A protein has these predicted regions:
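Intrinsically disordered, low-complexity, mixed-charge
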Residues: 7-181
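Positively charged n-region of N-terminal signal peptides that target proteins for export
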Residues: 1-5
Length: 181
């Protein structure tokens, strides 16, 4: 009896461990969410607002995009961990030093895109640096999907900008490196 009971107990325990792992994986994917929407406020264009949004995406390892819209709003899409999206949306509502405060974010659920592994600011320019050529700044999601600090996110963002900008625009950017965007 002992010879049969032990292998069955080991098999049962292994099954429990496998089931727990599957539940954990299921919970992780259940926390994944995608939202799309618009941000409105008094001053959210030409003040580094989309760069601030991208830095939030870098901090929280979120995919998506930020794009200026001719009506003065900013179109956004965020995809990733629900709690991290909530933190990013809270920061977007608050704004940055140069942007308006108490911004209105209208975001709705969107379908998850399992192939989306980047966050892009489309058509980035910098009024304060006199960079008028538009650039698409692309952040690649980290393999570990960990959160990083605001300072680390700023360093990553600077690296993205430095690797994307060309010629005089790159020189202008480097001259003002460390300025808030």
């Amino acid at each position: 009896m002992k010879l049969v009971a032990y292998p069955l107990a080991v098999l049962f325990a292994g099954g429990l461990i496998f089931a727990a792992a599957m539940l954990t994986a299921g919970e992780a994917s259940a926390q994944q969410e995608a939202v799309t929407g618009a941000v409105s406020g008094e001053a959210i264009q030409k003040v580094g607002f989309r760069a601030m949004i991208q830095k939030q995406a870098i901090m929280y390892d979120l995919a998506g995009y930020a794009r200026n819209v001719p009506d003065g709003t900013v179109s956004i899409s965020l995809q990733g961990d629900k709690n991290r999206i909530d933190k990013a949306l809270a920061a977007i509502r608050v704004g940055s030093k140069k942007s308006s405060r108490n911004n209105v974010v209208t975001a709705v659920s969107a379908p998850l895109d399992s192939t989306l592994k980047t966050f892009t600011v489309y058509g980035w320019t910098s009024t304060s640096r006199n960079i008028t050529n538009p650039y698409d700044l692309v952040f690649q999601l980290r393999p570990a999907s960990d959160e990083i600090s605001k300072k680390e996110a700023a360093a990553v963002w600077n690296t993205i900008a430095e690797s994307t900008l060309k010629g005089d625009d790159l020189d202008k950017f480097k001259k003002h490196l460390g300025d808030e965007d």
